[in-house]
Amino acid sequence: MNENVLIVAAHPDDEVLGCGGVIAKHIDDNDNVSVVFMADGVESRNYQDFESNISDRKTHALKACSILGVNNPIFLNFPDNRMDSIPLLDVIKSIEKIIDKLSPTIIYTHNDSDLNIDHRITYQAVMTSCRPQQGSSIKKIYLFEVLSSTEWSLSSYGSFVPNCFVDITNFIDVKIDALNEYLYEINEFPHPRSVEAVKALAK
């Protein structure tokens, strides 16, 4: 039976860095995959032309998702790196509406120890939205690693200790192709957000 898969990413680029290969694998398995972006990923960067850069980032996100095989990602447009300024209940309700509409069987989202505040709030909101209740469609929840956020977490947040691994050997190239849509996030090796580091983590 095909799965309904929901990716809840804090920002455009997190979906590729965190689970781009897994997304492509689900698509190859004929699963239904939806992607939700919680924050716009622009505001904290102090761009002068704010609206134009939001539009530009969305364009790149649409292209990246298309490369992975996902159509019509959802943009919730919470403020970048300021999701802690939004009442948590509002964030939870926005996710609950999407879950009610899409009835996902599998959800992927951030780890709770990530350094980035939006990642941690996204995790908290997703886990609250997925609390066990009668009639829930959700069977599995997976947390993914995002380079330069997960491994840079403070010790007080705990650490990411993965216990599930997926072979994406056949999908690493499409992951990199999608990542190249976010060129402003790619750095030179040995920075963790370099093509070489992303490939190394996938091995």
Kindly label every feature range from the protein language model.
Residues 1-8, 25, 29, 49-52, ...:
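Metal-dependent de-N-acetylase/amidase catalytic core
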Residues 7-17:
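Short, glycine-rich nucleotide/cofactor-binding loops
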Residues 10, 38-40, 146:
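Cofactor-binding loop segments of dinucleotide-utilizing enzymes, especially the Rossmann-like FAD-
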Residues 17-18, 56, 90:
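Short, conserved clusters of charged catalytic residues that mark active-site
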